[in-house]
Amino acid sequence: MGKKMTIASLILMTAGLTACGANDNAMNDTRNNGNTRPIGYYTNENDADRQGDGIDHDGPVSELMEDQNDGNRNTTNVNNRDRVTADDRVPLATDGTYNNTNNRNMNRNAANNGYDNQENRRLAAKIANRVKQVKNVNDTQVMVSDDRVVIAVKSHREFTKSDRDNVVKAARNYANGRDVQVSTDKGLFRKLHKMNNR
């Protein structure tokens, strides 16, 4: 019995010490030190490192739960801010064409593609009104970004290439050199409708 215990403990110690010699001086090797992009599986990020904007892409539940009482600099406490927000003006439209949320992403836009730019909103309204006048167009939803105009069209008849060309021609007059894309996809129409009405 004593020999078995001695042999078992010797094997265990040998197996444990084997890993110590596998990568000599690995602590000083900085070629593979794990500096990967954070992917959001943790909640210990310090929002102050990102100028307090609260956008660290941890995920919805983590964003709700982290930093609950850290001096009003979190995403959940939007009524108690310590600085002026980026856009506290009256909403641009009250007819449901555009969203009325002025305080999206606290003070900065996490993905600033130009969609929430007021000039782009006005331009989208002009394009939507003009495209609605095109023959065979019953309804339209328009999204304008800094480099693109996306138009979703609803029609009760088959939408031909000629109809599409007429929509592009009508929109190009307002597009200011932006790429104009026209779609009859119902899913895109619903998505743009939700985007414009949030």
From Swiss-Prot:
Disordered: region residues: 91-115
Keyword Lipid biosynthesis on entry: no
Record's note on what induces expression: Transcribed by SigG at time T3 of sporulation.
Signal peptide: 1-21
Pfam families linked to this entry: Spore_YhcN_YlaJ
Signal recorded as keyword: yes
Main location: other
One of the record's GO cellular component terms: endospore cortex
Keywords: Signal, Sporulation
Biased composition (Low complexity): 95-115
Cited InterPro entries: Spore_lipoprot_YhcN/YlaJ-like
Annotated compartments: Spore cortex
Any GO BP annotation: sporulation resulting in formation of a cellular spore
Note: Present in spore but not in vegetative cell.
Name of this protein: Sporulation cortex protein CoxA
Taxonomic source organism: Bacillus subtilis (strain 168)
Gene expressing this chain: coxA
